[in-house]
Amino acid sequence: MSTAHRVAVVTGASQGIGAALVQAFRSRNYKVVATSRSIKPVADSDIATVRGDVADPNTADLVFKQALDRFDRVDTLVNNAGMFMAKPFTAYSKDDYAAYVATNVTGFFHMTQRAIEIMNKQGNGHVVTITTSLVDQPMTSVPAVLASLTKGALNAATKSLAIEYAKKGVRVNAVSAGIIKTSMHPPEAHQFLASLHPMGRMGEESDVVDAVMYLDSARFVTGEILHVDGGQAAGHHAIEQGTGLGDLRVAG
C-alpha cells in the first residue's frame, strides 16, 4: 500500500521525540493522529490532534475515532508517551508509583488494545513502543526501578503480542532508548548524561525516529526490542566522576 494512504497514531506528540515522529511520518506522506495532554491544533489538514491523558480510556476512544472518521484506517501506533523519574527506590511515593503505572502501563494498554482491534479487522498493522535500556542494564548512578518495572513490562508485552498476532498481519516491536537529548534535559546535565553511554554521547531525537521508521518498514521484523542506546545494553562501562542525576524527571 502506498504511504499516501497510510495512517500513524503517535502518543506524547506535543514535544521532543513525539513531535519529531509526527513530522517524520508526515514527510513520508502518512496522515497522523497526534495526542498528548498539551497538544494544540495545527494547520495541516492531514494531522488530527487529540488532547488528553493516555491513561484515560476515553482518550484512546477519541484518538481512534478521529483516525477512522478522518482517515479510515490505522496502520501504525507509536506508544511514545511515558514518564521517568530517577530517585532512590525508598524515595518514591505512592503518587509516583500511581503516575508511572498510569502513563507507562495503563496508557499502553488502552492505546494498544484499540489499535490492534482495528488492525485485526484490516489484516495488517504495526505497533512500536518506546522503552528504556535501563531495563537491561541498571546503573548505580541512575536509580530508576519504576522505569525498569513499567518499561520492562512493555518489553515483555511487546514480545507476547508479537507472537499472539504474528499470523494476523499485525507486527509489534519496541525501541529501547538511551538518554535522548531533548529540551527536558538542561544543558548543564548533558556532559554527565553523555558519560552514561559507551559511545560517549547522548542520543538525538533523530536516532529514535530513524529506528521507528526502520521498524515500520521492516515487514519481516516482529517481537524485536531494538536498542538505540549508544551501547548501554551491551554492558557496563566506566563513568567519569562527577555530579549524579539527583532527582531527574522526564515526562512525555
Feature map (PLM): residue ranges:
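Substrate-binding pocket helix/loop in short-chain dehydrogenase/reductase
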Residues: 88-89, 96-98, 193
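A short, exposed helix-loop element centered on a Lys and neighboring polar residues
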Residues: 112-113, 159
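C-terminal substrate-recognition "lid" of short-chain dehydrogenase/reductases
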Residues: 171, 204-228, 233
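Short C-terminal tail/terminal secondary-structure segment
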Residues: 222-252
